[in-house]
From Swiss-Prot:
Function (record text): Catalyzes the irreversible cleavage of the glycosidic bond in both 5'-methylthioadenosine (MTA) and S-adenosylhomocysteine (SAH/AdoHcy) to adenine and the corresponding thioribose, 5'-methylthioribose and S-ribosylhomocysteine, respectively. Also cleaves 5'-deoxyadenosine, a toxic by-product of radical S-adenosylmethionine (SAM) enzymes, into 5-deoxyribose and adenine.
EC number, as in UniProt: 3.2.2.9
GO terms for biological process, alphabetical: L-methionine salvage from methylthioadenosine; L-methionine salvage from S-adenosylmethionine; nucleoside catabolic process
Reactions catalysed, as given in the entry: S-adenosyl-L-homocysteine + H2O = S-(5-deoxy-D-ribos-5-yl)-L-homocysteine + adenine; S-methyl-5'-thioadenosine + H2O = 5-(methylsulfanyl)-D-ribose + adenine; 5'-deoxyadenosine + H2O = 5-deoxy-D-ribose + adenine
Protein's name in the database: 5'-methylthioadenosine/S-adenosylhomocysteine nucleosidase
Positions bound to substrate: 78, 153, 174-175
Transmembrane regions: none
Superkingdom per UniProt: Bacteria
Keyword line: Amino-acid biosynthesis, Hydrolase, Methionine biosynthesis
Gene3D superfamilies given in the database record: Nucleoside phosphorylase domain
Pathway assigned in UniProt: Amino-acid biosynthesis; L-methionine biosynthesis via salvage pathway; S-methyl-5-thio-alpha-D-ribose 1-phosphate from S-methyl-5'-thioadenosine (hydrolase route): step 1/2
Length: 230
């Protein structure tokens, strides 16, 4: 099995890269792809760049050129579920865009024209991810909706506007829906495993800078456990 892991930033992929055996890097269209192995599994690690356009472009290249069997999107996220603290791990059961609105044409809020309203995570990958976070045994976790948009959610008014449309949302970030949409179009199973670096709207820019390394460490621990189980 070939497993693809996608993170947006260097801080989100550096521990994963360091864990790979026989790592070889290549750059395509400004995005970095590292191939290697972990626990005998073939891995392709993508540093996509920040935001949905970068994520969609680089994920398309990843799926077309490297042809992984499954995709794990990882890194940091902002918390929306008040029961989850900074450092908690969030596993997606579905992913949506929060900044798409073509409702005038009969679509749901967050639904892109011609696409499903939600991108469902693969059931097996969700189970593997949950078993992995339990095996690590150190982190609070939640499973649920993750939403994506091209905005850092530090404005309380924006945070509440998104919460109004997606009250069940666990976490927010800037790439997962783009990754999920491309996986949907390629019929490739995916799951999102992220850790909270901040709580959306609560001095989240300060918290993000401080706790990004913690979120990266926690998400990496769970992703590596998941890879070993696949």
């Amino acid at each position: 099995m070939k497993i693809a892991v996608i993170g947006a930033m260097e801080e989100e992929v550096e521990l994963l890269r360091a864990s790979l055996n026989n790592a070889q890097r290549t750059t395509i269209a400004g995005s970095e792809y590292t191939t290697g192995t972990y626990e005998g599994k073939e891995v392709v690690l993508l540093k996509s760049g920040i935001g949905k356009v970068n994520a969609a472009m680089s994920t398309t290249i990843l799926l077309h050129e490297f042809k992984p069997d499954v995709v794990i999107n990882t890194g940091s996220a902002g918390g929306y579920d008040e029961a989850l603290e900074v450092g908690a791990v969030v596993i997606s059961d579905e992913v949506r865009h929060h900044d798409v609105d073509v409702t005038i044409f009969g679509y749901e809020i967050g639904q892109m024209a011609g696409m499903p309203a939600a991108y469902k995570s693969d059931e097996r990958l969700m189970k593997v991810a949950e078993e992995a976070v339990k095996a690590v045994g150190e982190h609070q976790y939640g499973i649920g909706l993750i939403c994506s948009g091209d905005a850092f959610m530090n404005d309380p008014e924006r945070v509440e506007a998104v919460r109004h449309h997606f009250p069940q949302m666990k976490a927010v970030e800037m790439e997962a829906a783009a990754v999920a949409q491309v996986c949907y179009q390629f019929a490739t199973p995916f799951v999102v495993i992220r850790a909270l670096s901040d709580i959306a709207g609560k001095e989240s820019n300060i918290s993000f800078d401080e706790f990004l390394p913690v979120a990266a460490k926690h998400s990496t621990q769970v992703v590596l456990k998941a890879i070993a189980s696949l």
